[in-house]
Amino acid sequence: MLMTRPNLKGRSFLAEKDFTPEELLYFLDLAAELKEKKKNGIPHHYLEGKNVALLFEKTSTRTRCAFTVACTDLGANPEYLGKGDIQLGKKESVEDTAKVLGRMFDGIEFRGFNHETVESLAQNSGVPVWNGLTDMWHPTQTLADLLTIREHVGKLKNVKLVYVGDGRNNVANSLLVGGAIVGMDVRICTPESLWPAQEVIDLAKKYNEQVMITSNVEEAVASADVIYTDVWVSMGEEEKFAERVELLKPYQVNMKMIKETGNKNVIFLHCLPAFHDVETMYGEEVYEKYGLKEMEVTDEVFRSKHSKVFDQAENRMHTIKAVMAATLGNME
């Protein structure tokens, strides 16, 4: 644990940029502590008697499971509200919905499209709001990524993290800014047409001038400690599939790329789901249409000793638990 525990009670968790390096590192320390307590069967009911609304405008496996189990472990009561249960901006404004939910719940998670929606929930509900994913940021994922990197690399400061693929999506944005805040050497490797927005690059450079944005794979992956990728087409962008496949094929994470790092201990991360084989209906469909058995990562890399993707998935739960405990729980 950090020597000084920051007071985060009542804060919302919307994006990494809202927190200091010390606060982000505190979340990681607390997550590691709670992970150890769960492993050893030590109760940690910091949210005893609290009620938490889980709003899912976008479907999810890991985020929903992580928040649900985290709530239960912390002693809270989770209530799932899917897109058919909520009327955000349709029959009821986000502001009005926020005010109603804030009267009934002690905390609110939101996973959806517009970042403005989660900001409005935070502004109007009067309770902590946690961003489970928006089109702009994915901060709970980044906390899990940072915890996984610290567990396997041993530190975060000056660690070389290379994100390869669609450089404009929420995962890339959060890794770029979140990684820079904690002192990592973050590199985004993607075709120029998919480079992050300049405002995101500028924000990251405020924390770390070492930020690299490049289309050159060899330059990016040299001496990397971490290679990270994500799906080539995000939810809601399916019409861009053929174009993305052609654009990103040279950026597939394969064993050649792993070897080009020159680091035998390099780790591979992916926020999942990953399209590394044809064992899904989606994978079969892609194979029939495009002749691809693997997309953003090869099956060889995904199943190799370098891959830490399931540790990473588990860490979603521990880091989400830390965020909820720190912002809503009684930590005294």
UniProtKB/Swiss-Prot annotation:
Q: Name one GO molecular function term.
A: ornithine carbamoyltransferase activity
Task: Give the UniProt entry's GO cellular component terms.
Answer: cytoplasm
Is Nuclease given among the entry's keywords? no
What's the protein name?
A: Ornithine carbamoyltransferase, catabolic
Compartment(s) of residence: Cytoplasm
Q: What is its EC number?
A: 2.1.3.3
- Pathway terms, separated by semicolons: Amino-acid degradation; L-arginine degradation via ADI pathway; carbamoyl phosphate from L-arginine: step 2/2
UniProt keywords (A-Z) are: Arginine metabolism, Cytoplasm, Transferase
Presence of keyword Ligase? no
**What is an example of a Pfam family matching this protein?**
OTCace_N
Q: List the disulfide bonds.
A: none
Q: What does this protein do?
A: Reversibly catalyzes the transfer of the carbamoyl group from carbamoyl phosphate (CP) to the N(epsilon) atom of ornithine (ORN) to produce L-citrulline.
Q: Which superkingdom does the taxonomy of this entry point to? A: Bacteria
- Reaction catalysed by this chain? carbamoyl phosphate + L-ornithine = L-citrulline + phosphate + H(+)
Catalytic class of the enzyme: transferase
HAMAP family in the cross-refs: OTCase (MF_01109)
Q: Which gene encodes it?
A: arcB
Q: Which SUPFAM superfamilies match?
A: Aspartate/ornithine carbamoyltransferase (SSF53671)
Its taxonomic path starts at: Bacteria, Bacillati, Bacillota, Bacilli, Bacillales
UniProt binding sites for carbamoyl phosphate: 60-63, 87, 111, 138-141, 271-272, 316
Give one GO biological process term: arginine biosynthetic process via ornithine
